[in-house]
Amino acid sequence: MSSVSHSKQMGRPRDGRADRAILDATLRLIARRGISELRIDDVAERAHVGKATIYRRYRSKDELVAAAVTSLVSDISIPDTGSTEGDLRELMRGAVRVYRGSVEAGVMPGLVDAMSRDPKLARAVREGFLRRRRAALAAVLQRGVERGDLRHDLDFELALDVLGGPLFYRLLITGGPIDNQLADGVAELILRGFAASGARRRSK
């Protein structure tokens, strides 16, 4: 095979700037208009790319939306401070920094509504955004178990729900403040509610 034909098969490398522009444009349009009004034409215009550039990356609007929402996860670092308390506080403070942003806060209500109406979209978001995020959070909890700070029979699914629940309840339902006080309170709730027996005795 010639080097020319080989290079054609390989194709041009993806442009990371275009990737980011497409996802940012998608998030901003969702926040402004909702998912039902999201159009690929508008994403292309806002991102300054052609529609073909988008369709080479995402086969459908659902795939694009799921990828855009999943990109929010990459903005929340998974800390390793050396202590379970430090990890949980930094983890929740990172989530607070992301979800009190105007774009991120604007995306979630429309996303939840769209997921309730569109099983295909719901599945795409759960398999991308939620599964990836929960796996990263579970790694932090697992370190807490291994350090002896969290109980050895920890119910990971329940603990993960407790980590995310208060933030999204305020974001979607009550409109309460999403701040470091909330972040620290959730971390403390995990540390006390799921503490190993020895850790509970040491904290008294």
Where are these predicted regions, by residue range?
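Short amphipathic alpha-helical segment with a characteristic S/N-K-E followed by hydrophobic residues
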Residues: 22, 37, 60-65, 75-76, ...
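C-terminal peripheral helix-coil segments that are non-catalytic and often amphipathic
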Residues: 1-8, 90, 131, 135, ...
